[in-house]
């Protein structure tokens, strides 16, 4: 299911949060309403961690991660890093990365198996991304844009990319990622998809301006309703087993 929300009158919620299937980072200083939208969907399945990164609130643009790990820029201070580490599941690796392109969320898009990265990221950074996130890494662009994390959002089931991506490009990217992709928009026609949308394998959050048609595309390409049905089946199965006992 996809939920609409705003961060202090901004529809670019992906700037202020990072969502994976193992954790969610949200910026400090938001309204209780913003937090409650996330916590009502995610808790107790995964932790929702309130934090800043390097004293800034743009946690979604300066971090990248998946269920296996989290990468933060070298501007992340010791207190922030300690708070994040203490709040994450024990099996999630956390690492600071020295990279001149420090807006990692703009330069990297990843699911639990594959990452697409900015063509100019350091080789050492590429290796750290592969090791920490446990993914195969590919350097690429999307619709001639090097900021792949800005113009693409993926989970393990599908992905939404810049509306000007060609059919050939979609096929090539889908082959790299091994998931279906579609070109589209968020927030009533915005092509800055990474800023307006965050997803994991069962939930999505988007800006308040997102239209019903855009939400329908999101729920279909990321197969959110299928996951919801699977979760309901699992809950019914558990109840059945408990009744037998």
UniProtKB/Swiss-Prot annotation:
Keyword field contains Isomerase: no
Family designation: Belongs to the eIF-6 family.
UniProt GO MF annotations: ribosomal large subunit binding; translation initiation factor activity
Gene name tied to this protein: EIF6
Protein's GO biological process: cytosolic ribosome assembly; ribosomal large subunit biogenesis
InterPro entries: eIF6 (IPR002769)
Domain of life of the native organism: Eukaryota
Location within or outside the cell: Cytoplasm; Nucleus, Nucleolus
Subunit structure: Monomer. Associates with the 60S ribosomal subunit.
A single Gene Ontology CC term: cytoplasm
Cell inner membrane found in the keyword field: no
Gene3D superfamilies per the UniProt record, alphabetical: L-arginine/glycine Amidinotransferase, Chain A (3.75.10.10)
Identification of the protein by name: Eukaryotic translation initiation factor 6
Alphabetical UniProt keywords: Cytoplasm, Initiation factor, Nucleus, Protein biosynthesis, Ribosome biogenesis
Predominant localisation class: cytoplasm
Function: Binds to the 60S ribosomal subunit and prevents its association with the 40S ribosomal subunit to form the 80S initiation complex in the cytoplasm. May also be involved in ribosome biogenesis.
SUPFAM superfamilies assigned: Pentein (SSF55909)
